[in-house]
Amino acid sequence: MAFNLSKIFAHTDRDPLIRELTLDSRNVRPGDLFLAVPGIKVDGRAHIADALKRGAAAVAYEVEGATVLPITDVPLIPVKGLAAQLSDVAGRFYGDPSRSLNLVGVTGTNGKTSVTQLVAQALDALGQRCGIVGTLGTGFYGALQSGRHTTPDPIAVQAALTDLRKAGARAVAMEVSSHGLDQGRATALAFDVAVLTNLSRDHLDYHGTMEAYAAAKAKLFAWPNLNCRVINLDDDFGRELAGLKQESRLITYSQLDSSAYLYCRDAKFDDDGVRATLVTPQGEHFLRSSLLGRFNLSNVLAAVGALLGLDYALDEILKVLPKLEGPVGRMQRLGGADKPLVVVDYAHTPDALEKVLEALRPHAKGRLLCLFGCGGDRDRGKRPLMAEVVERLADGVWVTDDNPRSEAPTNIFDDIRPGFVTADKVRFIEGRGQAIAELIASATVDDVVVLAGKGHEDYQEIDGKRQPFSDLEEAATALAAWGPEND
């Protein structure tokens, strides 16, 4: 793909051919347009000279606060508010791919990954190939290429949508994070359906207050030309959002409020998932899903709402629901039968931990045991709150490392400890692998073991470096070593 610079920035004296866009000077290749913007940690304008050495055909830079620029024959384009325009710039370059896709945006503290994966699987089953952009990566269900951000940068998002469209996607289910909304990573995207799962404490290290966090999420539901909003009425913020006047269609869902468009009652949970009655304005329907837990039933309802928002018939949607699987690292089961049941889940907020433990309590014939940690360099205020939840709902608690990043694990433990009433009964173990091995070795065949916090992740971030690590692999190894003598 290559276009003249004038297609991207109309007012320019020279008009070189642009091969690609990039925000990182280290990725510049001859013919690229380097977009130099100040970031939280790095100012791209400090790397303009490097981009030119690597062959940049042009540079656009944030003019406010810019200092001395290199002397060059290459076009240097000053732009005021460049960061806020990146999504639109990338859209012009890539041909606005979202406008020829059915784009479903899913936001919320918990459940984004599950809902996007459910929507994608369902659309595939209904005959509309659906791509995915989110925490687990970008691509098609079962073949995702991992990325570092839930919502990629504005250029990466537009490039990903272009690639998915070329590969045959007619729809895309996309996780839309509060960071992505606040930073304008998706500004130029044409969302057809917006979904809210829930809102609870998270990311306050970035947003500062719950009000700012909620305001970032709310942006998605006032999106220009949005066709449909799908909102959870079992959530306080959801009820507030649903009460706002908007032109777009509103589909609400609930397990508690019978006034919801999708109201689910008489839910029966077992080891095979859930059976329930779905009440809609068109009548009652039987709903079946293999996913565990009441919170996953909410995720299923959110996916149903999104599919209705794309004008699929409810009867057709309900037919494919039993075939849909949960994502990797979300309530993922290992062991069981003649060994302890181990469940690996990404739960890393107080609310998510509470929902996971409540969902698994009925499955524990013996004890419900939980291992968790808290990420370094993130919201310290939620650390004691997570301790309170686990102590209240689990029979045994192991605290260990999550992704400590630049923090010492013992300092994170010190922040967690005040949340326990009886911290002397809690095991604090540095080294997540050792903690998992000890916990599973101590479990009996009737126990349920929850490994919370990392889910699908195949690394641990320590001192700024990602080291290979997988809860799933560690659990499998520990289960292989588990024998009847442990019981």
Swiss-Prot record:
Q: Which Pfam families does its entry note?
A: Mur_ligase (PF01225), Mur_ligase_C (PF02875), Mur_ligase_M (PF08245)
Indicate where this protein resides in the cell: Cytoplasm
What cofactor does this protein call for? Mg(2+)
User: What SUPFAM superfamilies has UniProt attached to this entry?
Assistant: MurD-like peptide ligases, catalytic domain (SSF53623), MurD-like peptide ligases, peptide-binding domain (SSF53244), MurE/MurF N-terminal domain (SSF63418)
Q: How is it modified after translation?
A: Carboxylation is probably crucial for Mg(2+) binding and, consequently, for the gamma-phosphate positioning of ATP.
EC numbers for this chain: 6.3.2.13
Catalysis: reaction(s): UDP-N-acetyl-alpha-D-muramoyl-L-alanyl-D-glutamate + meso-2,6-diaminopimelate + ATP = UDP-N-acetyl-alpha-D-muramoyl-L-alanyl-gamma-D-glutamyl-meso-2,6-diaminopimelate + ADP + phosphate + H(+)
Q: Name one GO biological process term.
A: cell division
Q: Which residues are recorded as binding UDP-N-acetyl-alpha-D-muramoyl-L-alanyl-D-glutamate? A: 23, 25, 150-151, 177, 183, 185
> Is Transmembrane helix among the key words of this record?
no
Q: In which pathway does it act?
A: Cell wall biogenesis; peptidoglycan biosynthesis
GO CC, sorted alphabetically, is: cytoplasm
Positions of modified residues (N6-carboxylysine): 217
Residue sites binding ATP per the record: 108-114
GO MF terms here are:
ATP binding; magnesium ion binding; UDP-N-acetylmuramoylalanyl-D-glutamate-2,6-diaminopimelate ligase activity
Q: Where does meso-2,6-diaminopimelate bind?
A: 378, 402-405, 453, 457
User: Which keywords describe this protein according to UniProt?
Assistant: ATP-binding, Cell cycle, Cell division, Cell shape, Cell wall biogenesis/degradation, Cytoplasm, Ligase, Magnesium, Nucleotide-binding, Peptidoglycan synthesis
Q: Where is this motif: Meso-diaminopimelate recognition motif?
A: 402-405
Q: What is the purpose of this protein? A: Catalyzes the addition of meso-diaminopimelic acid to the nucleotide precursor UDP-N-acetylmuramoyl-L-alanyl-D-glutamate (UMAG) in the biosynthesis of bacterial cell-wall peptidoglycan.
Q: Which family does it belong to?
A: Belongs to the MurCDEF family. MurE subfamily.
Protein name as annotated: UDP-N-acetylmuramoyl-L-alanyl-D-glutamate--2,6-diaminopimelate ligase
